[in-house]
């Protein structure tokens, strides 16, 4: 069967991440011109924060749906080739670019330090892959327990753990990702900050049909929760003490969950996935992993176009940072081992009128 909701959510999530980062860059470069609406822009940026949790949620959802009784032999080896090896390569590229951008001579020691921080601490855009691999390990170790345990208890406990974890570090480490300050600057990588999403995705994927039926039965609750949680995160962004624009906030956890439910409910009503959405979904991993580096091109473009208004600037960068990763991934995947550098392009297997999705859990 075709889990069309997955393709739609994956597409929307990766595009939302790109848009979020582009708006942040334009806001930084045009800070004076946009000063009067900066709060409004920040609120909109906050509303895009569901994207990374939703993208990561999909990985465990597909595992639970495809492998409820345990993953097949060679699972981690296969995932390592198509996901983790590209992660290591892009981590090296990022380390080289970031150490070069710091000015002065690029030393081997500085490169190694940044590379190790990228790989082990998730100190770059690819941190989400570390979270996904933790989900793989958790699924392999605990799927038997989760099958037997009460979902109400598991979800309740995991919700409290994740909310407490995010709440503490949101207060203790308010510094942005680029600033290594606070109690633990890379708190978003350990699974505790994502445990609720993992448990929720497991049960939603395992009981997919029942999950959709419940969403349909309580659809007005789903609509209301999305609106209420959206209003909450906007309010917190305006007046709350937890003012950082980040998906690693306890209120964002509520909002992201509501948006995931809303997307599953709405997209379950679709008869088919639009071709453009399917196309972008198939390249979503590469877009997510590579778009930040095409923003360097966008940065140079905007520096040479100081008079360009904010909206055209966002549209220009959005085109560059979406098309760039797609073309790069397409070109490298023409070579036998090109996927080892940028990830494999997902190609749904057609079986008459059905689409099998289990070979791409992330």
Swiss-Prot record:
TM region(s), chain numbering: 11-31, 44-64, 82-102, 119-139, 153-173, 181-201, 220-240, 252-267, 283-303, 308-328
Keyword Transmembrane helix: yes
Cellular component terms (Gene Ontology): plasma membrane
Cell location: Cell membrane
GO molecular function, one term: O-acetyltransferase activity
Enzyme Commission numbers on file: 2.3.-.-
Main EC class the enzyme belongs to: transferase
Pfam families noted in UniProt: Acyl_transf_3
InterPro entries: Acyl_transf_3_dom (IPR002656)
Record's bilayer topology term: Multi-pass membrane protein
Gene Ontology biological-process entries: enterobacterial common antigen biosynthetic process
Entry keyword Glycosyltransferase: no
Keywords: Acyltransferase, Cell membrane, Membrane, Transferase, Transmembrane, Transmembrane helix
Family designation: Belongs to the acyltransferase 3 family.
This protein's name: Putative membrane-bound acyltransferase YfiQ
